[in-house]
Amino acid sequence: MKKILVLLVFITSIFAADATIEVVNRGLVLPRILIQDATTNFASSDVRERFSRMIAGDLTVGSAFEVIEGIEKTTYDAPLGAEIAAKNPAFVLRYELAGGSGETMLKVKLIDTKDSSVRFEANYSQSDLKRWPFLSHRAIADIARNLELSPIEWMDKSIVISQYTKPGEARIIIADYTLTYQNVVLSGGLNIFPKWANVEQSAFYYTTHEKGKPTLYKYDLATRQKSRITSSGGMVVASDVSKDGSKLLLTMAPADQSDIFLYDLNTRSAKRITSYSGIDVNGNFVDNDSRVVFVSDRMGNPNIFATSINGGGVEQLVYHGKNNSSVSTWENYVVYSSRESGEEYSQRTFNLYLISTKSDYIRQLTATGVNTFPRFSSDGGSIVYIKDAGSQSAVGIIRVNENKSFSFPVNLGKLQSIDW
């Protein structure tokens, strides 16, 4: 039997205790912000120290401020001291952690140094101490929303990962975007290709093997129950979910060769979209769910194509690169990973590109290394991806509109797939 080409490449895993952020591109002059820690009674000194680095990192990735290096100690209601003038901040972000043994609480306020006015203030709580990174993510996302800055709601979203544990076995992990928080939700057997089921991230689809046959399941995070969706010989993978959550784009291979199918969750029926003797995989909704972007080898090498949600004629979207095998969509935008030829004897290079289905627009997003698994954020303004550069692996975050890129160096391991 001819093997199905799985175009989601095996990538190194991401299990770092703390992420080190590197700003790749710098542009506009941003207002300076000083961080002050007003914590006086918190049970975990380790979490307190790591939280200070996390909130500074979140502000940096948010790309709206220049974060002044170093965290000052103060009390929550203390007036601004004259000593901060030397650092010339436009804002002071002051926070206080409390608890830490059971419920963890966070108070945070943003102070305008011109007149000492409080521009934003809020309280947060988290019952599970292990989820402490989300306190920082939520606060910084709320500040951006309150000040009408570029939206970063994705910061408070989770990433779902499949990680190989040994040959023939993979577990599924829920993590924050820095992968500082990790929670194993499925283990035992082969659990691969997780895909969020809805914008609330209350459930995800994944593929496993049931009696030797690839089977698609839905896992509910609240009830910890799984429900069977469908199965198919060869392979079955949920690559995208419609905006209303009622339909899935599946890659299935009932007759050995993979094609794209539209699966209706209400009627539990599948409609074939592509019918090709080679390989069609990784379908993604685009153009308000009216079309499908997918990867196919119909021109020889894997490349990016599009067709109507009802099937029919196929349009080639990309005309460069030797292997365009990883793709994600948002509205009418497509981000993909493209293998490019470098100098003789040089290491292979996969760069990320952004195109539009409505124009000839194309933008190169990365320049070096092996950059794969691009995934749009929920608002389309950011892209997460996996970056390999020599012996160093990292999670990359691209702020598309801000023209900034960040990398988080990580420890090694083997990652099967990722969804944001």
Regions found by a protein language model. Give the residues of each.
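Amphipathic beta-strand/beta-sheet edge segments enriched in Tyr/Trp
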Residues: 79-139
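Hydrophobic beta-strand positions that form the internal "hydrophobic ladder"
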Residues: 159, 203-205, 248-249, 292-293, ...
